[in-house]
């Protein structure tokens, strides 16, 4: 879960959490909890984020570089 939080933070970059949350249609509080490792991501939200960044799910969860 920590690898996902670190990768997500790096991908979000300078974009505000609220703006990113709006773009991927995931509540801001949920994104914040992912970044703080307080909530495990659902498969549907993982797919939304992977699609948005055009990244492989394995990369997002830290299974490959």
Whereabouts are the PLM-identified features?
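Conserved hydrophobic/aromatic packing and binding residues within compact polymer-binding modules
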Residues: 8, 20-21, 31-34, 60
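Recognition helix of helix-turn-helix/homeodomain-like DNA-binding domains
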Residues: 25-40, 63
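A short, Lys/Arg-rich alpha-helix, primarily the initiator
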Residues: 1-19, 23
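Short coil turns linking two alpha-helices in DNA-binding domains
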Residues: 16, 27-30, 42, 56
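Short, charged recognition helix plus adjacent turn
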Residues: 3, 14, 51, 61-65
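DNA major-groove recognition helix of helix-turn-helix/homeodomain DNA-binding modules
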Residues: 44-59
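Short, flexible active-site loop motifs that bind/organize anionic cofactors or intermediates
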Residues: 10, 21, 36-39, 50
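Short, Lys/Arg-enriched C-terminal cap helix and immediately downstream tail that follows
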Residues: 11, 43-44
């Amino acid at each position: 879960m920590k690898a996902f939080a670190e990768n997500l933070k790096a991908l979000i970059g300078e974009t505000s959490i609220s703006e990113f949350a709006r773009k991927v249609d995931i509540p801001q509080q949920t994104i914040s909890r992912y970044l703080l490792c307080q909530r495990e991501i659902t498969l549907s939200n993982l797919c939304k984020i992977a699609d948005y960044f055009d990244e492989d799910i394995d990369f997002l969860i830290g299974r490959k570089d």
